[in-house]
Amino acid sequence: MGEGGTGTRPRLSLAQIVNMNVGFFGIQYSFGLQQGNMSPIYRYLGADEATLPLLWLAGPMTGLLVQPVVGALSDRTLSPRGRRTPYFLVGAVLCSLALLAMPFSPALWAAAGLLWILDAANNVTMEPYRAYVTDRLAPAQQAQGFLTQSAFTGLGQTLSYLTPSLLVGLGMSGDAVNARGIPHITTLAFLLGAVFSITSILWSVRTTPELPLTAAERARIAALPRGMGPALREIADAMRDMPATMRQLAVMKLFQWYAMFCYWQYVVLALARTLYGTSDPQSAGFREAGLVNGQLGGFYNFVAFLSALAMVPVTRRFGARWVHAAALTAAGVGMWMLP
């Protein structure tokens, strides 16, 4: 919120807009670590392939439950540090602790529990972050703010996927493992993620604090009903009033996210079988498949970043519906051919 409403939010320089979005780098680095490493970690700890989808439930379940609830609660929050900052800080601390502990998980149940904490913490941080951009930037700068956020999304995920390969390039052994069979390069990648998660959020909070609310804005928020019940009713009202276009997109997204989770859960296992002829998580071939997946993940995030820019003129010419259909068809063909 601005000091005097929407029209009085001060314009920020490009450097300030970058600073306020640095925290998104840490969030997305953490998500990239999960996508690229959780299935191998589960396999190192003894999980069989059929149980991987159950072990991955933390991601979609916390996204479904935590994001909308935290978004509604943060809209009603009044604190000395602002409306969004408390969620940033709590989420970043929990995320960092979970990342620190993950590669040292003593058993499968511990890793699964830590993933629930990690995903919940990331969602607690991420949902208010989007509102933070709207609160902090004048309407004319909000598109630039979200574009900068998207750039940090691509940077964070690309670097997280490439970190194990970069560590090998710097001289670490890809075959050195701890007592539970988890490679040391994976452990160090998660430790770096813990550092990035907390430091990037602290950087954004310190360099670009929230604007103070006016007395009228504070009075309006204070008058809102408190507690989980009103927040849930607000979510239900939003779903009931959802535009028809969003309802159509929801059906498409159901199948798109099904495909993406199948990819994240099984791509390392597929590469290990196809390229190295092994399904043994303790084999050198399986660890090499994890490195290959990181390189592929870094590449596809880079391609996604370039494609997002290229799609702007293409969409203007051919229309969003046909471009979207062509992109999903290409993705489906790629997934069909990958194994």
List the model feature ranges, each with a label.
Residues 86-107, 329-339:
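C-terminal ends and interior cores of transmembrane alpha-helices
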